[in-house]
Amino acid sequence: MGVIENIENTSFESVKKSDKSSTLMESKNSDLCPITPYLTEEKVKVTSRLNEDLSTPVEDVFDMCVSGSNQKNNLGTSAAKKKLVFSSNEYVSENECENGSLMETVYESVLEDIICKQAEDILAEILVSGSSRDVLKTPPSAARADGLVETCPGAPMKRKQVRNKRTVDMNLCRKLDFDSCV
């Protein structure tokens, strides 16, 4: 990680443009026109120490074995739970290491086969027996105790309003002068 040791602030200087637009603005109302600062000099010196120890901070290590709420509570206080070490100071003969890992692999393989065989036998018993077939089916829905129908009712219908329709004779409409209303 680089450490910034020295940063000089960038200096800005207020400079007014000497063109026609700025002189027109100044002559009208200099209080309303903003003056834009122009960059005159920029110096940034960044140095870092590359000989620092590069490591992940302890508080940022994620441990899968800790549950979510406990991990949030212990985030700052817990250290890394697992650390891989690839070099060992102890001398172990190659034959002992090979024999131990070979026996462990064989043991895990046999244990996995036994568990799979037992699971297959239990599943076969469930499928063969007639009474247990009902166990594997989805149960029928229970009758409702409140007496409501299980189907949804139809959409409500809008009530028709009965109006007294008046029939107007066409002769009467001709006699009315609609142009005078406008």
UniProtKB/Swiss-Prot annotation:
Superkingdom per UniProt: Eukaryota
Induction description: Up-regulated in response to zinc ion contamination, but not in response to mixed metal ion contamination (cadmium, copper, lead and zinc).
Descriptive protein name: Unknown protein 1
InterPro entries (alphabetical): SMR11/SMR16 (IPR038971)
